[in-house]
Amino acid sequence: MVEPLKIGVLLSGSGTNLQAIIDAAGEGLPVDIVRVVSSRPDAYGIERARAAGIPATVLNRGVYADPEAADARIVAELREAGAEYVVMAGYMRKVTPVMLEAFPDRVDRKSVV
């Protein structure tokens, strides 16, 4: 049996990408979504996460002094949850080196470019 990958999901909107991952996991994809972090409090993806029993956090970068501080907080949330990989599922913010260095080669970088 394959150990599931523990993933954290970052999102900013409706969460359709998150839902696709949730559905695929239900059909046998070996992933365990350990935390969802949203950049917006009104993102419907938060509701999708909670409906699936996945802990969800809203982290508004506006309350942090700089983007690096915000990413450091996101990294702390993901590490606390045990995330090994990060999936950017419609995340509409640029990530800083803080995030990329915390999860080297473990961030879905296609969304970063």
Kindly label every feature range from the protein language model:
Residues M1-V113:
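One-carbon transfer enzymes
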